[in-house]
Amino acid sequence: MHAKIILALFLGMTAFLAVQADHHHDHGHDDHEHEELTLEKIKEKIKDYADKTPVDQLTERVQAGRDYLLGKGARPSHLPARVDRHLSKLTAAEKQELADYLLTFLH
């Protein structure tokens, strides 16, 4: 149960990113849809989130985030489906890069 709470908190950040991207780009600008979030912007937001995460919770949150990025963990039902849509736009290499980036917060 504790792991589900941590996963939900970590993925809340993912949902926030998705909502921000949708809010910025869902104004009839479909031609710019590919510009929703760059890897660098995602990394900046992940860093901000990780910096605010209590050290004793960081390991579990990083693992939950890696599992979700690498397709080993499902999106919790309370998160909007658009989170999956945003992740689906990333290549496997980009998802792996973000998953590896998450590990840097454990050192």
UniProtKB/Swiss-Prot annotation:
Main localization (coarse): secreted
Where expressed (tissues)? Coelomic liquid (at protein level). Expressed in large fat cells in contact with coelomic cavities, in intestinal epithelia and at the epidermis level.
Q: Which UniProt keywords are present, listed alphabetically?
A: Antimicrobial, Secreted, Signal
Q: Which residues form the signal peptide?
A: 1-21
The answer, when asked if Ribonucleoprotein is one of the entry's keywords, is: no
What switches on expression, per the entry, is described as: After blood meal ingestion and upon bacterial challenge.
* Compartment(s): Secreted
Which cellular component terms (GO) are annotated to the entry? Answer: extracellular region
Superkingdom field: Eukaryota
In the UniProt record, does the keyword Signal occur?
Answer: yes
The protein's job, in short, is: Has bacteriostatic activity against M.luteus. No activity toward E.coli and F.oxysporum.
> Can you name this protein?
Theromyzin
Organism for this UniProt entry: Theromyzon tessulatum (Duck leech)
